[in-house]
Structures are given as structure tokens and as C-alpha cells.
């Protein structure tokens, strides 16, 4: 009876709740993070690969394997060369972020022909970005005649949007060119018919006016 009287149902419920919370936390923490897509290029921007990874180390491992590189690698943002050297910063990157991989001794450089801020002048120290627009031209298929274009706009450093214009192959380009040529020739034909009809009416009108003039003279 003393054992039963010492039994506290509230304490048992608290213990069960604590164990359940601990199990839920462990299950949640053990769940692997989701795979996210990234675009990685070499320091010359001649090789570009699309890779998925859940962590910075996993992405570095895949870059080593895919690009056949060796040694210590460094990942930086392709647009401005910001180093991606911590897991916390990596997790803050958006999907489809363009990254550049650098081997030992290599350094980031801007794209050739890229327009700089203020026509080459340095950006004022106390200025604030309103919008930043980046253009990325790439090929998904070596047979594509024109590369695909990715346009990414960031407003006030908070809101961003991107749009992909997919490239097309030679057959589709030829098809579109023939279609536009056909439409152009058809429109040109209608225009020539209209001009011909107008000239005919002008000539017939002139003949009629000349005939009426001669008739008045004879009368």
C-alpha cells in the first residue's frame, strides 16, 4: 500500500513526455538535410557543371570527382568572388547559385567584358544597393546553337528573382527561321499586290481622264 501511495501519476506523465520529446529531437536531428542544386565552374569559366549537395563538404567532394581536380579547393561566388568557407554561409545560399572553384594558386577574376559599376569608378562606401542584375550564359547541350541565358535580379539585397531563357538547337532555329521567312514573304506578297492594284487604278484613271478630255475637245 505504501508503494502504491508513493506512486505519482503526474510524475509518470512528465517522464513519458520527456522521453518522447528526446526521441523526436534525435529523429529530427538525424534526418539528412535536403539536396540542393548549384552551378560550379572552373576559374577560367570554360567548364561548368550542375551539382547537388546538402553540405559544403559534400559539394567539395563532388567537385573533386566531377572536375577531376586535386588538392585543396576553395569555393567562391562567381559574381563577386566572395569566399564560401563556412557551413553556415553555405546553407544561406540560394538554389542554383553560381560558384567558382579555385585550386591552390588560382584567384577569382571578373568576367571579361563585364560592365562595372559607374563606368569603372569605385562604388561609394556609404552607398546602398537598390538592384543587382547578373547575366549568366551557358550551354546545356553541346549541340545547342545558342547558349541558354539566366537572368538574376536582387532588390535591396533581400528579394531576388531569376528567369531562364533556354537555348535551342540548329533544327529548331532553322524551323523558326523558315517560318519567319515564309511569313515575311507572304506579307511582302500582299504588299506588292496592293501596290499593283493601286498603280492599275491610277493608270486606268489617267486613261479615263484623257479619254474624257479628248471627247470634250471633239464636241
Curated annotation (Swiss-Prot):
Its main location: other. The gene is Cideb. Residues 34-110 form the CIDE-N domain. This is Lipid transferase CIDEB. It is found in: Lipid droplet; Endoplasmic reticulum membrane; Golgi apparatus; Cytoplasmic vesicle, COPI-coated vesicle. Interacts with DFFA. Interacts with DFFB; inhibited by DFFB. Interacts with APOB. Interacts with PREB/SEC12; facilitating loading of SCAP-SREBP into COPII vesicles. Keywords: Apoptosis, Cytoplasmic vesicle, Endoplasmic reticulum, Golgi apparatus, Lipid droplet, Membrane, Phosphoprotein. The keyword Phosphoprotein applies. The modification Phosphothreonine is found at residue 18. Highly enriched in the liver. CDD domains: CIDE_N_B. InterPro entries: CIDE-N_dom. Belongs to the CIDE family. It holds the Pfam family CIDE-N.
Amino acid at each position: 500500500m505504501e508503494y502504491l501511495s508513493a506512486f505519482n501519476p503526474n510524475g509518470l506523465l512528465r517522464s513519458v513526455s520527456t522521453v518522447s520529446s528526446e526521441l523526436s529531437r534525435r529523429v529530427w536531428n538525424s534526418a539528412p538535410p535536403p539536396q540542393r542544386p548549384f552551378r560550379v565552374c572552373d576559374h577560367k569559366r570554360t567548364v561548368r557543371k550542375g551539382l547537388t549537395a546538402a553540405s559544403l563538404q559534400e559539394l567539395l567532394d563532388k567537385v573533386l570527382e566531377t572536375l577531376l581536380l586535386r588538392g585543396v579547393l576553395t569555393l567562391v561566388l562567381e559574381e563577386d568572388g566572395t569566399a564560401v568557407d563556412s557551413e553556415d554561409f553555405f546553407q544561406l545560399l540560394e538554389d542554383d547559385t553560381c560558384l567558382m572553384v579555385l585550386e591552390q594558386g588560382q584567384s577569382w577574376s571578373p568576367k571579361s567584358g563585364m560592365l562595372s559599376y559607374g563606368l569603372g569608378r569605385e562604388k561609394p562606401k556609404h552607398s546602398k544597393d537598390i538592384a543587382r542584375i547578373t547575366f549568366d550564359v551557358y550551354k546545356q547541350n553541346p549541340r545547342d546553337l545558342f547558349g541558354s541565358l539566366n537572368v538574376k535580379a536582387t532588390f535591396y539585397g533581400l528579394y531576388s528573382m531569376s528567369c531562364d531563357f533556354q537555348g535551342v538547337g540548329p533544327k529548331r532555329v532553322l524551323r523558326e527561321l523558315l517560318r519567319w521567312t515564309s511569313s515575311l514573304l507572304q506579307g511582302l506578297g500582299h504588299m506588292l499586290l496592293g501596290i499593283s492594284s493601286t498603280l492599275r487604278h491610277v493608270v486606268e484613271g489617267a486613261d479615263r481622264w484623257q479619254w474624257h478630255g479628248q471627247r470634250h475637245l471633239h464636241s
